[in-house]
Design a protein with these regions (language model features):
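Juxtamembrane intracellular "pre-TM" segments in multi-pass secondary transporters
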Residues: 15-24, 202-235
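Helix-to-loop junctions at the C-terminal end of transmembrane segments
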Residues: 80-91, 279-292, 378
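Structural signature of the two symmetry-related core transmembrane helices
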Residues: 94-108, 188, 294-309, 391
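Cytoplasmic helix-loop-helix junction between adjacent transmembrane helices
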Residues: 122-160
């Protein structure tokens, strides 16, 4: 216990000059970093298509199985607020490697769990330490020469988005062939392997902020209060991610109950969402052309339309409409996120890491809300009501977006 005050109150030593650490990254190294981000963040989404299997296996009531997804995302949000700021205090390579080892242990705990309590606790641990992805991305940015930084970070972010999109079909297919516990055994092994690879590949990096951890944490509420862009963009993404998780937590239940889909069928359906990652580069190009604000509106409208289509798909018993809804919704959520991150990255560089963490935490707070609501609403009132609640979340974001237009004289990202 005596070590905790030291971490909280002791400023870090003055590090070596930052410029000395820049080097040319090889394509192989960049690819490994992208894979590492994708595999780590995927752990947050593995359970979404599996709740129909895991809930009965653990004896969870149908109205409570949303907690299977929610606690992982709550853990991730807390990790963004508490773990990621440590990257401004502690040596980064050690922090990333230790976090990946903790994720591996949490995944092993999930695989071995025989009760809801142990499963939930292990899920929280996985989410908490999977926030290491938001340490690794700026770490890689630091390693890249300034002239190559945008390209390198773009590739790594593509890996992260690919992990988000491919997690659901991967876990569905493995669960169908080897059982749901195998998903977490396999991922635990992958996390330990990644920890070893990154320990060998990453150089040591000591942050140069000179700030104490407690001071960094105390600065977070002030950043929220003083940064209008963060508040607005955080609300947009919280509403979008709530709708996203309502859809993706509820649709496996719909497919199993109304369409008699097995896990292989659900895996094939979830592949539709993977195409959403293709929208990220398009969003970046729109932002580079100065279209951040209108493109945000297009993304919000697209998400609204997608969820209306999802309602119709349930009523008309149409898998084709549900696939169309999945394609549009995933693309819209990714576009909104990329545009929002670009707006945030344009803000003060000395606060960029904390602003990024706060923004992603807002998104996952909304996502956890959607995941928690979805199974209970689906159980009590069906797909139509659930999808309409998703429509309302996106509508709330649209209302805030439209409220900006009377103030055209004031430029906002």
């Amino acid at each position: 216990m005596s070590s905790i005050p030291d971490v909280v109150n002791l400023p870090v030593p003055v590090p070596r000059p930052e410029a000395a650490s820049h080097s040319t990254l090889t394509a192989t190294q960049i690819g490994i970093f992208a894979i590492a981000c994708g595999l780590t963040v995927a752990n947050i989404f593995y359970t979404q298509p599996l709740i129909g299997l895991i809930g009965p296996a653990l004896g969870l009531a149908a109205s409570r199985i949303g907690l299977i997804v929610t606690l992982t995302q709550v853990g991730y949000g807390i990790g963004l607020l508490l773990l990621v700021p440590l990257s401004d205090v502690l040596e980064n390579r050690r922090l990333v490697v230790m976090a990946l080892c903790a994720v591996a242990l949490g995944l092993l705990g999930i695989a071995l769990s025989d009760s809801p309590a142990t499963f939930m606790a292990a899920s929280f641990v996985v989410g908490l330490f999977a926030a290491a992805t938001q340490i690794l991305v700026p770490f890689v940015s630091h390693l890249a020469p300034p002239a190559e930084r945008g390209r390198v970070v773009g590739i790594v972010m593509s890996g992260l988005l690919g992990g988000v999109m491919l997690a659901r079909p991967f876990s569905s297919y493995i669960a169908a062939t080897l059982g749901w516990r195998a998903v977490f055994y396999i991922s635990s092994g992958m996390m330990l392997t990644l920890a070893l690879v990154l320990f060998r590949l990453l150089p040591q990096r000591r942050p140069g902020t000179g700030l104490a951890y407690a001071r960094i944490l105390r600065s977070l509420p002030r950043l929220v209060a003083r940064t209008a862009v963060l508040r607005r963009r955080g609300f947009y993404q919280a509403m979008m991610f709530a709708a996203f998780n309502i859809f993706w937590t509820g649709v496996p239940l719909l497919l199993a109950r109304e369409f008699a889909f097995g896990q292989v069928g659900i895996a094939l359906f979830t592949l539709a969402g993977a195409a959403g990652a293709l929208a990220a580069p398009i969003a970046g190009r729109l932002a580079d052309r100065g279209l951040t604000r209108p493109a945000t509106g297009w993304a919000l409208v697209a998400a609204f339309v997608a969820l209306v289509i999802a309602v119709a798909g349930g009523r008309l018993h149409s898998v084709a409409l549900l696939i169309l809804a999945a394609l549009i919704l995933d693309a819209a959520v990714q576009v909104c996120q990329v545009l929002s991150l670009r707006s945030i990255y344009m803000l003060a560089p000395e606060s960029r890491g904390r602003l990024n963490g706060l923004f992603i935490a807002c998104a996952f707070l909304g996502g956890a809300t959607g995941s928690g609501l979805a199974p209970a609403i689906f159980t009590f009132d069906g797909w139509g009501t659930l999808a309409n609640i998703g429509v309302l979340f996106v509508f709330a974001a649209l209302v805030l977006y439209l409220s900006e237009f009377p103030y055209r004289g004031r430029r906002t990202p």
